[in-house]
């Protein structure tokens, strides 16, 4: 399976890193981090995003967001699934309105036109009517809208356990088997 992980410049970059860390090793992963993602990672978490990604998944293929001619920008390359974690509202708007001027939005547009799973984890609060309309437009185009919302029923005691719940739910939405969180009724 081939999966693209897009990392936009929204708050919550550690969630993308946890997704990358927990992704099963047999999945071929392609990563595109926006310029703003690198800035936000450093400002919010003191993380050098380039180094962190390579440390977590040395076998991944990394692309520059401006490399619009990359293999993953074409439907014929055969990417199976894509996740954008976190998804800024700027990125959401670009995808919702068909703008593909960078590799993340172009790859997302390809997923929509090819009717392949595209998971979007929007990071913003509160949401304006415009933001909600853009998310609704994407949902109507079969994108999976999966914001990182906390859980209480798992009784998570650590930040890592909460992150694992989110990553596990995202994996579930993408059809990736996992045991990252306790299932309801399975205790």
Curated annotation (Swiss-Prot):
- Name the Pfam families on file: Flavoprotein (PF02441)
Q: Which UniProt keywords apply?
A: Flavoprotein, FMN, Prenyltransferase, Transferase
Under the GO molecular function aspect, what terms does this record hold?
flavin prenyltransferase activity
InterPro entries from the xrefs? Flavin_trans-like, Flavoprotein, UbiX-like
Segment forming the signal sequence: none
Report the coiled-coil segments: none
Q: Which residues are involved in binding FMN?
A: 9-11, 34, 123
Q: Does the keyword Transferase apply?
A: yes
- Tell me what reaction this enzyme catalyses: dimethylallyl phosphate + FMNH2 = prenylated FMNH2 + phosphate
Q: What is its EC number?
A: 2.5.1.129
Which amino acids does the record list as binding dimethylallyl phosphate?
153, 169
Q: Which domain of life is it from?
A: Bacteria
Which family does the UniProt entry place this protein in? Belongs to the UbiX/PAD1 family.
Q: What does this protein do?
A: Flavin prenyltransferase that catalyzes the synthesis of the prenylated FMN cofactor (prenyl-FMN) for 4-hydroxy-3-polyprenylbenzoic acid decarboxylase UbiD. The prenyltransferase is metal-independent and links a dimethylallyl moiety from dimethylallyl monophosphate (DMAP) to the flavin N5 and C6 atoms of FMN.
Q: What is this protein called?
A: Flavin prenyltransferase UbiX
Q: Give the originating organism.
A: Helicobacter pylori (strain J99 / ATCC 700824)
Source lineage: Bacteria, Pseudomonadati, Campylobacterota, Epsilonproteobacteria, Campylobacterales
- Gene that encodes the chain: ubiX
